[in-house]
Amino acid sequence: MPSYIVVGGQWGDEGKGSIIAYLALKDEPEVIARGGVGTNAGHSVFINGKRYAVRQLPTGFIQTKARLLIGAGVLVDPEVFFHELEHLKDFNVAGRVGIDHRCAIIEEKHKQLDRSNSHLHDKIGTTGSGCGPANADRVMRKAKLAKEVPELEPYLTDVAQEINDALDEGKLVLIEGTQGFGLSLYYGTYPYVTSKDTTASAIASDVGIGPTRVDDVIVVFKSFPTRVGAGPFPTEMSQEEAEKLGLVEYGTVTGRRRRVGWFDFDFARYSARINGATMIALTMLDKYDKNAFGVTDYDRLPKKAREFVEEIEGRVGVPVGLIKTGPELEHIIDRREVI
């Protein structure tokens, strides 16, 4: 698969970071690019028991041989960018990352507006990262671009050209999406959504490749979907139910407690169709069946867990190629060669 996109199929927090990190190490892509909105979405990954979280840089940073890129469609917050460069200096990120010169910049005024606007902060439940106001300025053609920020100059590049050149040379390219289908400005639970589309086609556009250059779309689903902030959640369970099941989680960016629900097969099928999914990655199967924890062989999954996977494949209509059975990178079942 010369190029593949990983996107969220629910309301974000599906565990895309752990899937991307695994693919980055297992497949050794030569280029890893991040699409999506901006710093309003955090990806986290556990490496040798230590948790790393990023909001700006690609989660594939752990593949130290890869070129890391931030596509033109992504908003850049210089403060967050440089903080992550320092935080991840052991991975030599600064020497490998490129920002598209056309990226719009999140300024302090955008963050202040995001946090003080009653509609965005109180009703919608925005993360306060400034992404919505920054995208609004971009639509109005008022936003500052990365090429206008002197301190970013050493990192500037043409991401679209780099990626298309890499594909022409037969290199493997991994493209990361952020957030999830249910938060898409067009297809999500409007108005409780993010400030742009989050589907695979939008992520491809963010980094500058056309639809014919995408070979696979991996949509990530969580065994128990979650969402942060306000908005419809048809299969939501009570906090008491979530606590009994050990499903208490907090957002990477906001620190707010996540709402938890039961797996919605109809929503998952619709999400897979709109995203053009060729494969599903299922996370937190060990939360659905605690006896699945740490299993790395599909045939060794307990009956309850295996039946759940088979039901997803049957009702969603897409094969499940990757299954996370725990938080560590090695807690995964890779079925890509047999599906």
Curated annotation (Swiss-Prot):
<feature type="binding site" description="in other chain">
    <location>
        <begin position="13"/>
        <end position="16"/>
    </location>
    <ligand>
        <name>IMP</name>
    </ligand>
</feature>
<keyword id="KW-0658">Purine biosynthesis</keyword>
<feature type="binding site" description="in other chain">
    <location>
        <position position="179"/>
    </location>
    <ligand>
        <name>IMP</name>
    </ligand>
</feature>
<keyword id="KW-0479">Metal-binding</keyword>
<feature type="binding site">
    <location>
        <position position="42"/>
    </location>
    <ligand>
        <name>Mg(2+)</name>
    </ligand>
</feature>
<dbReference type="GO" id="GO:0005737">
    <property type="term" value="C:cytoplasm"/>
</dbReference>
<dbReference type="InterPro" id="IPR018220">
    <property type="entry name" value="Adenylosuccin_syn_GTP-bd"/>
</dbReference>
<dbReference type="InterPro" id="IPR042110">
    <property type="entry name" value="Adenylosuccinate_synth_dom2"/>
</dbReference>
<feature type="binding site">
    <location>
        <begin position="42"/>
        <end position="44"/>
    </location>
    <ligand>
        <name>GTP</name>
    </ligand>
</feature>
<feature type="binding site">
    <location>
        <position position="141"/>
    </location>
    <ligand>
        <name>IMP</name>
    </ligand>
</feature>
<keyword id="KW-0547">Nucleotide-binding</keyword>
<feature type="binding site">
    <location>
        <position position="13"/>
    </location>
    <ligand>
        <name>Mg(2+)</name>
    </ligand>
</feature>
<keyword id="KW-0963">Cytoplasm</keyword>
<feature type="binding site">
    <location>
        <begin position="12"/>
        <end position="18"/>
    </location>
    <ligand>
        <name>GTP</name>
    </ligand>
</feature>
<dbReference type="Pfam" id="PF00709">
    <property type="entry name" value="Adenylsucc_synt"/>
</dbReference>
<feature type="binding site">
    <location>
        <position position="258"/>
    </location>
    <ligand>
        <name>GTP</name>
    </ligand>
</feature>
<dbReference type="InterPro" id="IPR027417">
    <property type="entry name" value="P-loop_NTPase"/>
</dbReference>
<protein>
    <recommendedName>
        <fullName>Adenylosuccinate synthetase</fullName>
        <ecNumber>6.3.4.4</ecNumber>
    </recommendedName>
</protein>
<feature type="active site" description="Proton acceptor">
    <location>
        <position position="13"/>
    </location>
</feature>
<keyword id="KW-0460">Magnesium</keyword>
<feature type="binding site">
    <location>
        <begin position="324"/>
        <end position="326"/>
    </location>
    <ligand>
        <name>GTP</name>
    </ligand>
</feature>
<keyword id="KW-0342">GTP-binding</keyword>
<feature type="binding site" description="in other chain">
    <location>
        <position position="194"/>
    </location>
    <ligand>
        <name>IMP</name>
    </ligand>
</feature>
<feature type="binding site">
    <location>
        <begin position="284"/>
        <end position="286"/>
    </location>
    <ligand>
        <name>GTP</name>
    </ligand>
</feature>
<feature type="binding site" description="in other chain">
    <location>
        <position position="256"/>
    </location>
    <ligand>
        <name>IMP</name>
    </ligand>
</feature>
<feature type="active site" description="Proton donor">
    <location>
        <position position="43"/>
    </location>
</feature>
<comment type="pathway">
    <text>Purine metabolism; AMP biosynthesis via de novo pathway; AMP from IMP: step 1/2.</text>
</comment>
<dbReference type="InterPro" id="IPR042109">
    <property type="entry name" value="Adenylosuccinate_synth_dom1"/>
</dbReference>
<dbReference type="GO" id="GO:0046040">
    <property type="term" value="P:IMP metabolic process"/>
</dbReference>
<comment type="similarity">
    <text>Belongs to the adenylosuccinate synthetase family.</text>
</comment>
<feature type="binding site" description="in other chain">
    <location>
        <position position="127"/>
    </location>
    <ligand>
        <name>IMP</name>
    </ligand>
</feature>
<dbReference type="GO" id="GO:0004019">
    <property type="term" value="F:adenylosuccinate synthase activity"/>
</dbReference>
<dbReference type="GO" id="GO:0044208">
    <property type="term" value="P:'de novo' AMP biosynthetic process"/>
</dbReference>
<dbReference type="GO" id="GO:0000287">
    <property type="term" value="F:magnesium ion binding"/>
</dbReference>
<dbReference type="GO" id="GO:0005525">
    <property type="term" value="F:GTP binding"/>
</dbReference>
<dbReference type="InterPro" id="IPR001114">
    <property type="entry name" value="Adenylosuccinate_synthetase"/>
</dbReference>
<feature type="binding site">
    <location>
        <begin position="252"/>
        <end position="258"/>
    </location>
    <ligand>
        <name>substrate</name>
    </ligand>
</feature>
<comment type="function">
    <text>Plays an important role in the de novo pathway of purine nucleotide biosynthesis. Catalyzes the first committed step in the biosynthesis of AMP from IMP.</text>
</comment>
<dbReference type="InterPro" id="IPR042111">
    <property type="entry name" value="Adenylosuccinate_synth_dom3"/>
</dbReference>
<keyword id="KW-0436">Ligase</keyword>
<comment type="subunit">
    <text>Homodimer.</text>
</comment>
<feature type="binding site" description="in other chain">
    <location>
        <begin position="40"/>
        <end position="43"/>
    </location>
    <ligand>
        <name>IMP</name>
    </ligand>
</feature>
